[in-house]
Each structure stands twice: as structure tokens, then as C-alpha cells.
């Protein structure tokens, strides 16, 4: 599991305990300045074959892993991912400049407000958790991760014809990657299931944590059944 920018395992805190009967979840935090290098480190840590989950920038990293070693990926879960190149690199560079100038907290406020759907039932709690994760990561991690995000390659190609069970778990009010983007991904993947979570922005596992559990479990069961060639009993 590859968390979003400035996030760690707390992004999946509600889901992790509910999945241990189906998988052995491992959350890999990353802080490389280059997606290809980050992907190489993920592959070094992973088993011969694994299922892959990525949220936002972690989803871009997941696609880089998939590009590097497609035969090792048995299933894919993406949330809030734009598979193309960065939509606003100049704006992202300005954010980096502000952080270098000591304005990390101000930049965090901007990012957090855009990540979390303000009208959501758990918006305040989600914002608190997001800020806590970001402060644990700190400005240096932000600068390294954001460099990887800004310079990432277009990875739409790795999705075309992808034939592993794929979950697209999306917040309906996602301000970074629209539901239309998720539908475009689903159109390219042979075995995709799109689940749109209402009352939710960019981080469904944080904003609507309980609502995500059934979708993730259903996806993991599909992965297991594909591997076994038979339904789970």
C-alpha cells in the first residue's frame, strides 16, 4: 500500500485490521525524488507477486511499479490518481518555493483544504489526521515527494488492456482527480470495478473509512479467486 503525498499508514488505519484474513498488508512510505527510483525500492521490498494499492501520488508510484514489473502485480487498487503528467507543474514549483521559504504550514493548509471535502461528515477529523501525518513527514519529505510527482511520466499506457482485478475507489467530490478520470481508467482496464464514495473528496479511506471496507474486501476476494481459479468458500 502506497500512501498519498505526506501520508503514512494512518491513511489506511480503519481498513488494515479488516483485511488480515485476506492479505498481509504492508504500507510502504516513500520519499524519493524520482518515481522510477521509488518504484525500484518498492520492488526490492515486495515478494515475487503481490497486489498493489496506491492513493493519489502513491497511485502514480503504483503505476510506475506496474510499468517496471507488470508480471509481479496480481491486483491493483487506485484512489484519486491522474495517470498523466502533472497538470500544473508551475503551480507545484511555487508550492516548493514556499516550503523552502519556511511556509510549510501555509502550504499544508492549502493542500489539506483541497484534499478533504469540506461538507463531509468527518471533514474536521479527517483534516486533523491529515495534518498530523503531514507534520510527521515534514517539509523535506514534501520537497522530495513533490519533485517525483512533478517529474512523473505519463502512465496511461500501462493501464491499456491491464488484465488483473482492479479497484478504482474514488471520492465523488475529488478536487484533484475527477470521477471522469476514474471512468477513463476503467474504460482501459479489462477487469475494473469503479466504486464512487459519496460525501467524500480526495482521500476516501480517511474521509469515509468504513464505506471503503466492503469495496476493498470484494476486490481482494476477486484477486484470490483469480489466483485460485475458483470461488472462495
Language model features: what each stretch is:
Residues 86-88, 105-161:
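Conserved alpha/beta-hydrolase catalytic His-Asp/Glu region
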Amino acid at each position: 500500500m502506497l500512501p498519498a503525498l505526506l501520508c503514512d499508514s494512518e491513511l489506511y488505519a480503519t481498513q488494515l485490521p479488516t483485511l488480515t484474513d485476506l492479505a498481509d498488508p504492508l504500507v510502504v512510505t516513500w520519499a524519493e525524488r524520482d518515481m522510477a527510483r521509488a518504484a525500484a525500492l518498492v520492488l526490492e521490498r515486495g515478494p515475487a507477486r503481490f497486489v498493489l494499492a496506491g492513493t493519489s501520488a502513491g497511485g502514480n508510484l503504483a503505476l510506475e511499479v506496474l510499468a517496471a514489473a507488470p508480471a509481479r502485480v496480481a491486483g491493483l487498487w487506485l484512489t484519486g490518481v491522474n495517470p498523466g503528467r502533472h497538470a500544473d507543474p508551475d503551480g507545484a514549483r511555487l508550492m516548493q518555493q514556499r516550503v523552502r521559504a519556511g511556509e510549510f504550514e501555509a502550504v499544508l493548509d492549502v493542500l489539506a483544504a483541497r484534499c478533504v471535502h469540506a461538507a463531509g461528515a468527518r471533514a474536521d477529523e479527517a483534516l486533523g489526521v491529515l495534518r498530523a501525518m503531514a507534520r510527521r513527514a515534514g517539509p523535506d519529505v514534501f520537497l522530495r515527494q513533490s519533485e517525483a510527482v512533478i517529474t512523473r511520466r505519463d502512465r496511461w499506457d500501462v493501464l491499456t488492456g491491464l488484465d488483473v482485478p482492479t479497484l478504482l475507489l474514488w471520492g465523488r467530490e475529488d478536487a484533484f482527480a475527477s470521477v471522469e478520470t476514474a471512468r477513463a481508467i476503467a474504460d482501459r482496464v479489462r477487469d475494473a470495478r469503479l466504486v464512487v464514495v459519496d460525501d467524500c473528496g480526495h482521500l476516501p479511506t480517511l474521509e469515509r473509512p468504513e464505506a471503503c471496507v466492503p469495496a476493498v474486501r470484494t476486490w481482494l476476494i476477486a484477486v484470490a479467486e483469480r489466483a485460485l481459479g475458483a470461488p472462495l468458500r
